[in-house]
């Protein structure tokens, strides 16, 4: 049974039995710094997952999947093993935790052991649950990844689908960006 969403109550009871990642990321121009916010307060035992740093540095597009080797190194540095239950949360309007959840699935982490905190840090704080400034020092692990390349489609496959209609494509941008009424805040995508 996949538990892709876990409640704040569940996480509070299981904090000592999961690996926790704060994957907060903010759109450019918001004047918010996710790492500074993490240093001020985060859920106990959380490590900060930097979406900018932990994405492909070789692509001209932002936030592309990292290489298998880079993913293994990053996740090993967090002390996460292949058998750990990983819970990801964020404190951003773009729900960046879902992107990191997808990365774990792409690199074949057991789908039963990768979850997103329902409501994120916002809900955790609204419920007056405990936060800390203490930095979690993880012991390095030896995480092994295997790419599930079927989870990524290229431009040709997308274009072919316009004719074949074999799958539904969902654009997750907000309505203003979707209709071109608001500029793309990431200059690499203009």
Regions found by a protein language model. Give the residues of each.
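Aromatic- and Gly/Pro-rich amphipathic surface segment
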Residues: 39-43, 47-78
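A general structural signal for stabilizing positions within well-ordered secondary structure
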Residues: 37-40, 106
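Thiolate-centered catalytic microenvironments shared by cysteine-dependent enzyme domains
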Residues: 62-156, 160-161, 181-182
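Poly-acidic low-complexity segments
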Residues: 32-33, 50, 110
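Acidic/polar N-terminal loop/beta-strand segments that form early-domain functional surfaces
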Residues: 23-26, 49-54, 91
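A structural signal for short, well-ordered beta-strand segments and their strand-loop junctions
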Residues: 20-22, 48, 87-88, 113-118, ...
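Short active-site-adjacent helix-start/loop capping segments
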Residues: 28-31, 55-58, 94-98
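Flexible, polar/low-complexity N-terminal or interdomain linker segments that lie immediately upstream
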Residues: 1-36, 44, 121-189
């Amino acid at each position: 049974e996949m538990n892709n969403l876990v409640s704040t109550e569940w996480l509070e009871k299981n904090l000592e039995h999961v690996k926790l990642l704060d994957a907060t990321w903010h759109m450019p121009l918001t004047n918010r710094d996710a790492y500074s916010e993490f240093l001020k307060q985060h859920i106990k035992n959380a490590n900060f997952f930097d979406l900018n740093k932990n994405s492909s540095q070789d692509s001209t597009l932002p936030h592309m999947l990292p290489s298998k080797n880079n993913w293994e190194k990053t996740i090993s540095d967090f002390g996460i093993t292949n058998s750990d239950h990983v819970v990801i949360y964020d404190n951003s309007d773009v729900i960046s935790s879902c992107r990191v959840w997808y990365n774990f699935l792409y690199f074949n982490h057991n789908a039963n052991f990768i979850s997103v905190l329902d409501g994120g840090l916002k809900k955790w704080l609204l419920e007056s649950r405990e936060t800390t400034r203490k930095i979690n020092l993880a012991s390095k692990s030896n995480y092994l990844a295997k790419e599930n390349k079927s989870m990524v489609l290229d431009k040709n496959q997308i274009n072919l689908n316009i004719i074949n209609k074999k799958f539904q494509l969902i654009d997750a941008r907000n309505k203003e960006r979707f209709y071109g009424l608001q500029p793309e805040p990431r200059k690499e995508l203009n």
